[in-house]
Amino acid sequence: MITCAPEQVQHSPLPPSSMTRMGTTRRRVLAVGVIGPGRVGSALLEQLRAAQPRLARDSALELKLCGVVASKRMWLDCDDAELNARHGGAQIWRPNDLDAFAGHVRGNDGRHALLIDCSANDEVAAHYPRWLAAGLHVVTPNKLAGSGPLPRWQAIRAACAGGARFRYEATVCAGLPVVQTLRDLLDTGDELFAVHGMFSGTLAWLCNRHDGRQPFSALVREAHALGYTEPDPRDDLSGLDVARKLVILAREAGWPLSLEDVDLEGLVPPALAALSRDDFMQRLDELDAPMAAKLAAARAEGGVLRHVAQLDRHGRASVRLQVLPAAHAFAHTRLTDNIVQFSTRRYCDNPLSVQGPGAGPEVTAAGVFTDLLRIAESLEARA
């Protein structure tokens, strides 16, 4: 089992001197542009700032922040060393223009350039094929590219044929090494039989806490107050976010899956799904009786309720609430843990498991940072 404790995933899993040990002694410069300075983007900017002296000293790597794009404005650097280290109030912002931003980061001097999209915006994801074809590397925790329309995903992969790299580890389970683990298994000739996982920290928390002592609606309200859910809890309860993550893994494994192909059973009935958010919150109690019945049925079988995503060797995918044996690994996770199990030819009797915190800006940003460093490892020093 690969287990990542919170304090572990906040740091890069690549040793500071890994690039130096591999023989790279010439200084390399990577121009970086960040789109979406929200919770994850801001955490990433701080991690980049804090790591820059160590990377320059131990790995001969300089990360040059060339700009930041917010929802309506963008900032472009002015080659000032201090301003280059972080974005802030001293800089001049201008109207948002993604094409101009990408062109600025890429420059015209043959530099290595990388765009990081932390926006969760479908319009931004639509630019990826063009950016990659132009030679810009792209790293993102944005699930809309990997789980969106299949033709766009295929265009993204085709655009990488020119040498640009596209990495998206943080789209599945934040900073946990899920996508890379699957990629490594397949690249070394293993055969994937099945994927099982709990991909939602919110739903894991609700299932772990739902023991009959409180109505399910009270737990949803508590999770909402704690910030565990999206502003509209139905975004979590629907299971759609989990389905997106499963589609991403399926495509990584070679199956041309779309969201419509996932057998998705959410926890919100159609009558409540059609309401406004405020009306839904007022009628949240209507979930109590069906969820209590599901809990009673699970206990009658000697099992527990867990929200599970699964993919079989034929590409069939499902996301639903399931009754699992009390001895099952998914029955013994920490409150908000994500866990993914890969059943393969090599890991058949005892699946390979990846488990740990699957949400939060710090761990998600660390997953993005790890992808950046993996790309940096492959770059040649340029004069």
Residue ranges and their predicted role:
Residues 21-33, 39, 47, 64, ...:
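NAD(P)-dependent dehydrogenase/reductase Rossmann-like domain
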Residues 42-43, 122-126, 141, 148-150, ...:
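Short glycine/serine/threonine-rich phosphate/pyrophosphate-binding segments
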Residues 118, 138-141:
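Glycine-rich phosphate-binding loop of nucleotide-binding enzymes
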Residues 132, 160-161, 224, 299:
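Anion (oxyanion) recognition and catalysis
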